């Protein structure tokens, strides 16, 4: 990845709330399926904004280190009826589409949304808020901490 896109908590909440608005009216939804781990954060915002209390998880491991995607491993799958009909599946982003394709097979009738989308996977989700170039790594706020940054003159 040659570029980085740093997301702050404020930015993330703003984008997740925008996604929530697009999912109104809330009465059409039975619940949320959060894709662990990145989808847990937007799921919390969606649950609050839409007044939903039924939250399930699907746990898929694909990034085995910070930069490299590996073979998908389904660690846990939410058991919901009718292929996820009436459920929102949410993840933080769709990148190559590998995880999204697996999710689509598991929950073909769910509404699949993400906060961020890269070109290779964007067509696999029903809605998203922000376009991100394919060669850009997203630094999510839950992966960051506050730290001292030395002045440029000291490098």
From Swiss-Prot:
Annotated GO CC locations: cytosol; plasma membrane
Pathway: Purine metabolism; GMP biosynthesis via salvage pathway; GMP from guanine: step 1/1; Purine metabolism; XMP biosynthesis via salvage pathway; XMP from xanthine: step 1/1
Catalytic activity: GMP + diphosphate = guanine + 5-phospho-alpha-D-ribose 1-diphosphate; XMP + diphosphate = xanthine + 5-phospho-alpha-D-ribose 1-diphosphate; IMP + diphosphate = hypoxanthine + 5-phospho-alpha-D-ribose 1-diphosphate
Positions with a binding annotation for xanthine: 95, 138
UniProt keyword annotations, A-Z: Cell inner membrane, Cell membrane, Glycosyltransferase, Magnesium, Membrane, Metal-binding, Purine salvage, Transferase
Cysteine disulfide links: none
Membrane topology: Peripheral membrane protein
Subunit structure: Homotetramer.
Cited HAMAP family: XGPRT
Recorded family membership: Belongs to the purine/pyrimidine phosphoribosyltransferase family. XGPT subfamily.
Role played: Purine salvage pathway enzyme that catalyzes the transfer of the ribosyl-5-phosphate group from 5-phospho-alpha-D-ribose 1-diphosphate (PRPP) to the N9 position of the 6-oxopurines guanine and xanthine to form the corresponding ribonucleotides GMP (guanosine 5'-monophosphate) and XMP (xanthosine 5'-monophosphate), with the release of PPi. To a lesser extent, also acts on hypoxanthine.
Protein name in the entry: Xanthine-guanine phosphoribosyltransferase 2
Species annotation: Haemophilus influenzae (strain 86-028NP)
């Amino acid at each position: 990845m040659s570029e980085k896109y740093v997301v702050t908590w404020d930015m993330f909440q703003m984008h997740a709330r925008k996604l929530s608005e697009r999912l109104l009216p809330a009465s059409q939804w039975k619940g949320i399926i959060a894709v662990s781990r990145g989808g847990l954060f937007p799921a919390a915002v969606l649950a609050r904004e839409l007044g939903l209390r039924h939250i399930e998880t699907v746990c898929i491991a694909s990034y085995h280190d910070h930069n490299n995607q590996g073979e998908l491993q389904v660690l846990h799958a939410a058991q919901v009826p009718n292929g996820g009909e009436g459920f929102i599946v949410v993840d933080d982003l769709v990148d190559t589409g590998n995880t999204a394709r697996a999710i689509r097979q598991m929950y073909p009738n769910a509404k699949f949304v993400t906060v961020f989308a890269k070109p290779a996977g964007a067509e696999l989700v029903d809605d998203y808020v922000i376009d991100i170039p394919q060669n850009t790594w997203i630094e999510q706020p839950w992966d960051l901490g506050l730290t001292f940054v030395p002045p440029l003159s000291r490098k």
